[in-house]
A protein has these predicted regions:
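Gly/Ala-rich beta-loop-alpha elbow adjacent to hydrolase catalytic centers
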Residues: 63-72
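Short beta-strand/loop motif that positions the catalytic acidic residue
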Residues: 138-139, 144-147, 151
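Conserved alpha/beta-hydrolase "acid-adjacent" motif
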Residues: 152-158, 184
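Hydrolase active-site cap/lid region
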Residues: 73-118, 174
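Histidine-bearing beta->alpha loop at or near hydrolase active sites
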Residues: 174-188
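Active-site nucleophile elbow and catalytic-triad environment of alpha/beta-hydrolase enzymes
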Residues: 118-135
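Conserved acidic catalytic loop of the alpha/beta-hydrolase fold
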Residues: 32, 42-58
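Cap/lid segment of the alpha/beta-hydrolase catalytic domain
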Residues: 1-40
Length: 203
């Protein structure tokens, strides 16, 4: 298979020189900046899709883990050229996740208090980058979700909410483990292949 590995904005070589860790810049400049960053990520991927389409690539799919899963879910909402989408341990409400993380949640709550912003308003401010805000652009039988039963970083409720939003899409696979330790990874990789074979994405 031909695989395109995408480096998201503010990750790896794309991070700022003063960034304390990869991905820091994604969250560190406020809600509007997070929206712009996600829009940038989706734009980058779609530019690559345009290029691959021009080369004559017959079909494309997307998968990603963690923030990559979040991005994969949003891409499935905006680009119907995808043959399949398989978000892995995705989040669906970035605001709720930020509020649960420490110390990010502490800083976010201080900012919200100073700005007199409620949690509802904060959620609405980043709703544009959530897959829950859109109907999927591809058929539900071409969507698959993977989640860790013990994930505390991207809690299972996020995957379940997305599954319901996607009208209980094609497949939902739970694995033993958490966000970092994927026990039985071989099983969900086989499940992914079975799913892709079922929709005729792979022979």
């Amino acid at each position: 298979y031909d695989i395109l590995l995408v480096t998201l904005p503010f990750h790896g070589r794309r991070q700022e020189r003063t960034s304390p860790f990869s991905g820091h810049g994604w969250f560190s400049h406020g809600f509007c900046h997070m929206n712009e960053t996600m829009g940038h990520a989706i734009h980058d991927i779609r530019v690559f899709m345009d290029y691959l389409e021009d080369l004559g690539v017959p079909q494309m799919g997307v998968t990603g883990i963690s923030l990559g899963g979040y991005t994969s879910a949003l891409l499935a909402a905006v680009d119907g050229r995808l043959r399949c989408a398989i978000p892995n341990v995705p989040v669906v409400s970035i605001m709720d996740i930020v509020l649960e993380w420490f110390p990010a949640g502490w800083f976010a709550r201080i900012g919200m208090k100073l700005g007199d912003i409620s949690v509802t308003e904060a959620r609405a401010s980043v709703a544009i980058q959530s897959a829950l805000s859109f109907k999927p652009a591809i058929a539900k039988d071409r969507l698959m979700l993977i989640a860790g039963a013990g994930d505390r970083f991207a809690p299972p409720k996020h995957t379940h909410i997305l599954w319901e939003h996607w009208q209980r899409c094609g497949r939902l696979h739970w694995f033993l483990g958490n966000h970092l330790i994927h026990l039985d990874k071989g099983r969900y990789l086989r499940a992914m292949r079975s799913f892709m074979k079922h929709i005729k994405f792979v022979p």
